């Protein structure tokens, strides 16, 4: 499908890109406070968002102030933009307080594992991208992998599993380890060295689960709202564009006193909305199982290019699909080979 074609794209390190962007922002006068998480939303008396307070630093596990104690500070603004990502706790507070998910489908989540490998030169093919679906998962579990051959003999390897799986014995981490034993993967990383690894949550609900993204005094951008394109397994580009639209909205709000609701109007007219609309039916179709999901996705994405005249729904939150252990078969995972 076109949604998974990466021709003429660049394979880069997102961490390096973010560091470079931080330098550009600071050169323009932006202040960045790494290591100081926002812990509390501040409100005006009328209930509109006033800003955030950062967390007190230098507190021991008993709650006592250490010598390194630094009190949190209040950061106030005419408009506060929340860009915390998929697990943003303040964003979720706002969604609940302002009922932003009214009439929306339950949000869907996944967990993704990623490793960076330095592999042997004979196994490296810079620019090569590979996606897989299914194995080692069963037919009823949503998931797939990615592999990007980057520069300097590095490979970015990862696996994403939807958290709507049914079997409580399923271990996402162990499924990823088993995935690496597949001959097609093993031959690439064999003789290599894992130099970095991590895991993070992904937001998978797409357009059907996207909440209202504005409220009095604040905006949601990126995966604090849920702009990830799940079939692409990419969300940085949509998050950045939503931030650009938010900036345009704030300028018009301050200069022309326009209502923040224009943010949603601008978002709906952007390529981000069109992209999410075209991808909207992919994730829910896999509730029918891997085989039917792949067949439907082929029809939806290749033949109709995401323009089918109907929208599939997410009928359940992820945790509601989990079945009792007594009804499911225990999964025996192979021991790690430590290779």
Q: What label would you give each PLM region?
A:
Residues 1-48, 53-64, 69-82, 86-92, ...:
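Conserved N-terminal/central alpha/beta ligand/cofactor-binding core
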Residues 97, 111-140, 204-206:
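Flavin-dependent oxidoreductases
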Residues 104, 167-170, 209-212, 230-238, ...:
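Alpha-helix capping and helix-loop boundary segments enriched in small/acidic/polar residues
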Residues 139-198, 237, 253-256, 260-264:
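Conserved FAD/dinucleotide-binding core of flavoprotein oxidoreductases
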Residues 187-209, 221, 326-339:
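A glycine-rich dinucleotide-binding beta-alpha-beta segment and adjacent secondary-structure elements
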Residues 199-230, 261:
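FAD-binding beta-loop-beta segment adjacent to the flavin cofactor pocket
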């Amino acid at each position: 499908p076109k949604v998974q074609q990466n021709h003429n794209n660049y394979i880069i390190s997102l961490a390096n890109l973010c560091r470079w962007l931080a330098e550009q922002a600071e050169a323009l006068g932006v202040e960045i406070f790494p290591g100081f998480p926002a812990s509390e939303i501040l409100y005006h008396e009328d209930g509109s968002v006033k800003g955030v307070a950062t967390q007190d630093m230098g507190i021991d596990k008993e709650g006592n102030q250490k010598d390194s104690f630094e009190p949190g500070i209040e950061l106030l603004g005419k408009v506060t933009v929340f860009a915390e990502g998929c697990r943003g706790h303040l964003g979720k507070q706002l969604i609940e307080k302002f009922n932003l998910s009214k009439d929306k489908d339950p949000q869907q989540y996944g967990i993704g594992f990623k490793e960076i490998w330095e592999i042997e030169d004979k196994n490296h093919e810079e620019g090569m991208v590979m996606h897989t679906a299914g194995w080692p998962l069963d037919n009823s579990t949503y998931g797939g992998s990615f592999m990007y051959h980057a520069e300097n003999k590095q490979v970015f390897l990862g696996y994403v599993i939807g958290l709507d799986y049914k079997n409580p014995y399923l271990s996402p981490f162990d499924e990823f380890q088993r995935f690496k034993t597949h001959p097609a993967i093993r031959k690439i990383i064999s003789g290599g060295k894992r130099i970095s690894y991590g895991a993070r949550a992904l937001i998978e609900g797409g357009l059907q689960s996207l909440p209202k993204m504005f409220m009095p005094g604040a905006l949601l951008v990126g995966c604090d709202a849920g702009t990830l394109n799940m079939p692409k397994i990419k969300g940085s580009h949509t998050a950045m564009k939503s931030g650009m639209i938010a900036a345009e909205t704030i300028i018009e709000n301050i200069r022309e006193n326009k209502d923040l609701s224009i943010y949603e109007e601008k978002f709906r007219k952007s390529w981000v909305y069109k992209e999410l609309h075209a991808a909207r039916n992919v994730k829910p179709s896999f509730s029918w199982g891997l085989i039917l999901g792949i067949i439907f996705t082929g029809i939806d994405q290749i033949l109709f290019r995401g323009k089918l005249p109907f929208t599939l729904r997410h009928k359940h939150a992820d945790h509601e699909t989990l079945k009792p252990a007594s009804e499911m078969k225990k999964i025996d995972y192979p021991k790690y080979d430590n290779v």
